Amino acid sequence: TADYYLAPLAAVLRMALSSTSALEGGKTIVEYRATGEVPPRMTAQREQALERIGDRQGLIRELATIADVSDAVIRGLVKAGALEGRAVDLDSPFPEPDPDHAPPVLSTEQAYAAGILQAATATAEFEPFLLDGVTGSGKTEVYLEGVAEALREGRQALILLPEIALTEPFLKRFHARFGVEPVAWHSGLRQAQRRRAWRQIAAGQAKVVVGARSALFLPYRDLGIIVVDEAHETSFKQEDGVHYHARDVAVMRGHFEGCPVVLASATPAIETRHQVELGRYRELKLPGRYGKAELPAIEAIDLLADPPERGRWIAPKLVGAIDATLARGEQVLLFLNRRGYAPLTLCRTCGHRFQCPNCTAWMVEHRLIRRLACHHCGHVIPTPRACPECDAEDSLVACGPGVERIADEATALFPDAKVAIVTSDTIWSPAKAAEFVARMEAQAIDIVVGTQLVTKGYHFPNLTLVGVIDADLGLEGGDLRAAERTFQQIMQVAGRAGRGEKPGTVLVQTHAPGARVIEALVSGDAESFYAAETEARRDADAPPFGRFAAIVVSSEDKDAAHDTARTIARAAPRVENMDVFGPAPAPLAMLRGRHRFRLLVHATRQIDVQDVIRDWLGALEWPAKVRVAVDVDPYNFL
């Protein structure tokens, strides 16, 4: 990893030894669980705590978080005898999953694909697979049969998920299949949990690990299969520190371990499709949804011909569809990939715009918490009552919509509907994700307004209408993957509709209904869309046909960053079939108080870009206050 991504070896080693206490001796902690006793004094908070804790066990702080009460409430339940403590060995083995606990009933297509994965797992040889199935086709059930085979062979399994929030719903599905939960690995774990997982994985006693991209670097004793779920997701690319792509590192690790690697996706990346065309990956297709469920019908709403009312963002046709859906007692999802209430706040008296002092980015209004926040560095200020430039009061205006604004509009249009917002601001932990799922399943939510977080992995049979508020949002900026990402994102969110026996409908609001990506979504012709995108990449020698590498120079001293970037550019080697562009100010010219300049290396696939850059930069020196970062195969061009 360090060699391919030109990352410091120490940084990669830090990821591998991610639990600082893992090499220490044995430890115990005290965890608490319900006794079944009813406390003499039952308050509303105590009742809520006992109900939400159920049969869970954990530290006082963990149980308080689960129950959404204070630590004092939990301590009171302990004193009242409703909760009891027990010493837990931090290194106690995890219960082993049973591969034959509850085998699923598979369709013919699923059984065929599962059989191939089981055979590949039994041979214990490296082979990469693309499990390409439409949303709702049952990809999870298929790759879990590969996991079951690894368990029968006495080996370990790793399943990577793109979001921490997906972990809790997945754990429930896994428990239903194997009788126990897998070992979870993500940034939300406390140090003691990380230590236990790390040690049990290294000993080979933790059989199945489900986690975020960092789970790739854990010390498995004998991996039998690796699965990358939602493998197209850009969140698998790490943008800070070591700039690695978990999808590609998973394939690399599978090669080292001698085990199959499954990339599961309803909308595979062009790079993955290209590997199938070259014969390097084997494709397994699931062309239809499981059971009686059908793919939803997708229709575009031309916002030029059918615009929303003034001051609103939901077009009349979508309003009518929401009304009809709610009247049938069904659920609605409104999708807008923009957190907060509005992306820009300005003064209508003097024109002042609120910009982050640390980044070249606007401050986003979050009306729920009455704050303006930068989504790049996290800088937060209270929403002011007056303009800081001209002191005018009541002159600040919110420009553009975010999910909070759409939720307000939905509430105004349908006052009897129960509206919920789902973003990383509201679903910040697996426990919060589980709470959201429970509310949806209990019909306690009528309209969900969410960002890309709701496009991944959720299954709600009563959700039959999806409205995409702004399909053009992701097409801005000139990114070479913009159209592909838009197609993937909308297809994924469309896949939330009609997953049960009730048919689903998707309405896509756009100012460009004739755009190739919108036409492909409406027609369902993914193959033609991907063929055109692939040909455009081929003509431009862009990935997967060519290579990119970004060199980002940054410093708190703008002149020092600029001078270093120019020095690097002047020293660029002359290599046939390789071009160096820049330096130029990065689109995000300042980030976290550091001024940024970018160079872009473009080469054919025959060029060993890593060797060229290693020799090039290795011969140079720059001031200590300047950082030079290399991003091989970049996904983010900011």
What are these regions (language model features)?
Residues R14, S18-P40, E299, L304, ...:
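Accessory helical-bundle/CTD segments and flexible terminal tails appended to RecA-like ATPase motors
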Residues Q191-A192, A203-A206, D240, H245, ...:
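Cys/His-rich Zn2+-binding cysteine-cluster or related metal-binding knuckle/ribbon modules and their
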Residues R199-R221, A434-G457:
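Conserved two-lobed SF2 helicase motor
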Residues P182-Q191, E233-Y244, L304-R312, S395-C399, ...:
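Flexible beta-alpha connector loops of hexameric P-loop NTPases
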Residues T1-S265, T272, E277-A293, L326-A327, ...:
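Accessory, non-ATPase domains that flank or precede helicase/AAA+ motor cores in DNA-metabolism machines
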Residues Q156-L158, F178-L189, Q355-N358, V364-R367, ...:
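Conserved RecA-like helicase motor-core motifs
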Residues Q57-I60, T65, A361, R371-H376, ...:
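Conserved nucleotide-binding/hydrolysis modules and their immediate coupling elements
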Residues T140, R155-F170, I322-R348, L396-A407, ...:
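Conserved strand-helix element at the start of the C-terminal RecA-like helicase core
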